[in-house]
Amino acid sequence: MMSTYKRATLDEEDLVDSLSESDVYPNHLQVNFRGPRNGQRCWAARTPVEKRLVVLVALLAAALVACLAVLGIQYQTRTPSVCLSEACISVTSSILSSMDPTVDPCQDFFTYACGGWIKANPVPDGHSRWGTFSNLWEHNQAIIKHLLENSTASVSEAERKAQVYYRACMNETRIEELKAKPLMELIEKLGGWNITGPWDKDNFQDTLQVVTSHYHTSPFFSVYVSADSKNSNSNVIQVDQSGLGLPSRDYYLNKTENEKVLTGYLNYMVQLGKLLGGGAEDTIRPQMQQILDFETALANITIPQEKRRDEELIYHKVTAAELQTLAPAINWLPFLNTIFYPVEINESEPIVIYDKEYLSKVSTLINSTDKCLLNNYMIWNLVRKTSSFLDQRFQDADEKFMEVMYGTKKTCLPRWKFCVSDTENTLGFALGPMFVKATFAEDSKNIASEIILEIKKAFEESLSTLKWMDEDTRKSAKEKADAIYNMIGYPNFIMDPKELDKVFNDYTAVPDLYFENAMRFFNFSWRVTADQLRKAPNRDQWSMTPPMVNAYYSPTKNEIVFPAGILQAPFYTRSSPNALNFGGIGVVVGHELTHAFDDQGREYDKDGNLRPWWKNSSVEAFKQQTACMVEQYGNYSVNGEPVNGRHTLGENIADNGGLKAAYRAYQNWVKKNGAEQTLPTLGLTNNQLFFLSFAQVWCSVRTPESSHEGLITDPHSPSRFRVIGSISNSKEFSEHFHCPPGSPMNPHHKCEVW
């Protein structure tokens, strides 16, 4: 995500903590003034020499008292006292239990900060990863459960719909009674599936239109509505590559390395086919293998994410007529008019596409593929998305595949956790008001706004010191930073029952019919998407719901968003020292702010438009600075598998810039407000606590399978390298922890972008 603040050394801090008031003036240093046994001598009886000596002694004593007073003031100013409040003792205990103080912080700061936490927190059953974010999300889940199960007369109609949805999910008796019937009826309604019975041979276009709009699936490609990157005040239809059942093309193309996953995926497909009435396995398996082979063909033409980072290069705006020429396998005008009905689409409709080559190749692939296989593949997309809403047999099949895919150990997780997560994913904004009222203090927005303001100021201070950026680009960058809009806690409309009900007016939840409610929501969410096409983008439309433990930056809106779910401990606690808050939520704020200037965000101007607003000299200098990080992170590995320094570049830039901005902001805060009290027993300065707080946010564990998946899909580096990658580039970290030059956490060569 420097000042006059005294950066006390570790030894000085320990000494101060060990002194009590009686120790400051030990008895053997006390001075007693005693007169003669016969009483004091009269002043008049003293000789002139004695009188002069007495006056001199008095003056010297007065001077000594003055000096002691000055030293006392300086002592109090420079030496923070120890915080012994209940909150400080509690947070100290938490910090200590997470640490492994036997590890040298200059050798391995992540293990120093998180070693205790990792030993005490193996990956829980039913999970493939666990960390600070997971812990807080479980806390939020428990709150949501209570709110959903305890309805009140004052809730809005939208909130009641969320409660109906949740209760239908919890009605396992009804779900078990229906078994696979809801999905089997849906497949029949769509014209059938050759895996389970007869199918309509002439309905390719119709099936594609229905599964795209009514059920929000994305076979072959994805279609959605979003702000036009080059005209951010307008929404536009956008089309992009899609259609893989596994998380990344790498799973299909690196067959030897991923043989276990591919076998598990095929077995999962066969099992679902059998559960849906597909008959004998020797009939189902060959057809499912064909679907898997088709997905492999899609993977072969899918562009890797690391080659799609330059948005100026991949952005193309075409008309519907031009798209028809580019990808003729789809009858685009009927397709678009059907899914966007009642909006009328003609041949001149602008459409943004992100990979011409992919769309051309997928069109060729469709034309050269048997219609039966195309139908099987499209219905498989629907089955894969909807089977989790069916009975326990489908849950068991899903868990078995998750064990292969992510290393998740099968467990009997409480049903309510599944239902809370699904309700939040589906109707998170509808239940948002309940969560906000229960957890979000009225002044939290103001406090968060103040922190954001401090981080922005610190970022702009760093911006002014950059040597690689020309002055014109620097001026424009400052204007962009000034223009970043803050969204905190929740979108305003959710707290107005009338506005909230208006948003969810067209969605109806039916008691006790879980599958039906989920299908209705897919259709509703697509209708909401289609409805945006002729409207301007709206800041109140968030990509994350209020309970989410996360944050994000939107380049087309030039805004940073912090849901209520993350504005809690351990990221922020009003009773904790600000060293911890700046190291927690401060770094999160700095991270999102820096995204406005990472390798993708920097391409958007202050108004959210994709255009070349940098001078060429600064673009080239930026590429040189970022090349350092690509190499640095590319040298890290997990279980012998390297981190992709190119794919993770944007997040690595944000991690480093966020830490730097938050540190500078904390120094500014101390300069303005004075040194804080320190925490007891740790023997750490507040500057050291800042870095420790940052690191402990990322304490986490993952299964080997999940680590592999993260390395090939996640744009973030693994947690360990988010910590050591950032602090090893921080000169201030090495100063505060006294790391020798050349030690692992203080390399001679450091990378810096912002």
From Swiss-Prot:
The keyword Cell membrane applies. Disulfide bonds join 83-88, 106-739, 114-699, 169-419, 628-751. Inhibited by phosphoramidon. It is a single-pass type II membrane protein. The chain crosses the membrane at residues 53-73. It is found in: Cell membrane. Zn(2+) binds at residues 591, 595, 651. The active site is at 592, 655 (proton donor). Belongs to the peptidase M13 family. This is Endothelin-converting enzyme 1. It comes from Bos taurus.
